[in-house]
Every structure is written in C-alpha cells, then in structure tokens.
Amino acid sequence: MPQNITTGFRALVDAAEREIETLPIEEALSLHGKEDVVFVDIRDIRELDREGRMPGAFHCPRGMLEFWIDPHSPYHKPIFAEDKRFVFFCHAGWRSALATQTAQHMGLKPVAHIAGGFGAWKKAGAPIEPPKAAKP
C-alpha cells in the first residue's frame, strides 16, 4: 500500500518561512565579513565540491545541525555557543528555511536564512571560492 503523505515539503518550507527571518540577498551581502555574523552552509559536501563555497562560511551538513547546536550533544561544535548572528543557507533556500526554523526552535538566536540560498549568492556576483578541480 502506498504512503499517504499529508504534508509536502513545500508546505513545511512555507510554514518555516512564516516563523523565521529571511534575508534578501542584498542584506546578506552587507553582512558578509562582519565579525558578529556566522554564515552557516548546510549543503552536502558534494555540493560544495561541485558548486564552490562562500568565503568564510562554516560548513554544517544539514543532517548534523541539531547535534552540532546542542551543547549537551557529544557532537556539539563550540561555534554555535558564540554570541553571534547565524545566517543559514543551502542551494535554493528550502533546506535552510527548515534548518533556521529548527535552530530557532532549539533556542539559537538570532538566526536567519538567505532568500534563494547559494544560487542567489552566485547570481548576485558575490565572492565564491571555486569548486574543487575534478579528479582525473
């Protein structure tokens, strides 16, 4: 018997976006490089290798987010205990909306995500570290 999915990903993303702060790309660009802001790249490592990286961004795979934020987790990353603003992004802004909502529910603040994600970042001509060279 097939599964009956009652809430699709789009509804989850829309609900998250009603709760969280979404930064237009122009605002994200103005925050880049500030000492009190941490950009958190939640894309998969293969995406980073394929598409490039935002200079200075902290990479936190989406699957580890809750474990890295929680100070009681054996996987906690101290960066998430710092008194900073956390700006999440993925490729298009869907996963980062959900990640930002989760971080906010966990008590991390202030948090936001970038509208359009890394795709919007690249389209705006923002700085990127190029993708790793393909292996021969």
Residue ranges: model-predicted function:
Residues V40:
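Active-site flanking residues adjacent to catalytic metal/cofactor-binding acidic residues
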Residues F89:
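Short, surface-exposed ligand- or partner-binding patches at beta-edge/loop junctions that are enriched
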Residues M1-V37, I45-R85, W94-P136:
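Rhodanese-like catalytic fold shared by cysteine-dependent sulfurtransferases
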